[in-house]
Amino acid sequence: MKLSNQFLITITLLITSITFAQEAPHFKPGEDPRQPHQEWKLIENMSDEFEGKKIDEKKWQISGQGWIGRAPGLFLAENISLNNGSLQITTTMLPEPIVKNNKTYTHGGGYVGSRNGMTYGYYECEMKANKTFMSSTFWLINEGKDRLGCDKRTTELDIQESVGQITNDADWMKYFDQTMNSNTHSRNIPEGCEYEKGSSKGKAELGGKAYEDFHVYGVWWKSKDEIIFFLDGKMQSKVTPPADFDIEMYLRMVVETYDWNPVPKDGGMTGSKEDRTTTYNWVRSWQLVDSKN
């Protein structure tokens, strides 16, 4: 069967655009921090275009790795799907409350975590939040269970945490549904280890609600003491974490409940499935390396 020239041109352009899209992180002109002798290398085992029919569980873990969710939100693998080239995590109301570990769960969320970790690099995703009181997030955290000594401490790098419906009257929550809420956390310091406990924040305005449109949320984990946050390819803030961020961390895409943004009286699940779904079009992780040329 002969293929038309127009069809071949279309396919070629499509393949070229896909390839080009993965040559470097999403930066606006003049924002790429790489030097002339450097290039961005895509880290395949921490990146995904979500083009398949089901999530790649060799790359992503969807059961929570022992973390079942903060009550009243329970992580459910059935709430995670791939649809039209996107990863979707849908919030739900459970048919009946479930009691686990003496805690009552009434809602369902979802957890997607990378099986592989990395240190310094650039991490980004294109995400649109759900409209509910539950979260839409993109972040990194270390895993201390197999670590020794002071490396058992916790380091967490929150690139974006938002909600679609604010149910808390606190001043700091006023714009949580329309900002890029970024953070660095240091906690669980083992006894005898001289690391600071605390948090250092970054913030940027989205120009609308987090659920109204897709945004590209990114972070350049430049060094142990310099974190730079990007929104839609533009640098927003630089943060010095409270302790050295030099431990390998793993990606997390999580939809959960927050105890500081409680369930509304109507249960918060009255919207359509689309309204109740957080969508990730892609996630990409990069390392800055010396050019081969």
Swiss-Prot record:
Q: Where does substrate bind?
A: 67, 70, 156, 161, 256
Pfam families annotated for this entry?
Glyco_hydro_16 (PF00722)
Q: What would be one Gene Ontology cellular-component term for the protein?
A: periplasmic space
Q: Give the positions the UniProt entry annotates as the active site.
A: 156, 161
Q: Which residues form the signal peptide?
A: 1-21
Which keywords does UniProt give here? Glycosidase, Hydrolase, Periplasm, Signal
Domain GH16 intervals: 38-291
Q: From the Swiss-Prot or TrEMBL record, state where the protein is found.
A: Periplasm
Q: Cross-referenced SUPFAM superfamilies, in alphabetical order? A: Concanavalin A-like lectins/glucanases (SSF49899)
Enzyme Commission code(s) on record = 3.2.1.178
List the catalysed reactions.
Answer: Hydrolysis of beta-D-galactopyranose-(1->4)-alpha-L-galactopyranose-6-sulfate linkages in porphyran
User: What Gene3D superfamilies would the database entry show?
Assistant: 2.60.120.200
**One Gene Ontology molecular-function label:** hydrolase activity, hydrolyzing O-glycosyl compounds
Q: What does this protein do?
A: Cleaves the sulfated polysaccharide porphyran at the (1->4) linkages between beta-D-galactopyranose and alpha-L-galactopyranose-6-sulfate, forming mostly the disaccharide alpha-L-galactopyranose-6-sulfate-(1->3)-beta-D-galactose. Some longer oligosaccharides of even number of residues are also observed. Inactive on the non-sulfated agarose portion of the porphyran backbone. In contrast to PorA, tolerates the presence of 3-6-anhydro-L-galactose in subsite -2.
Q: What is this protein called?
A: Beta-porphyranase B
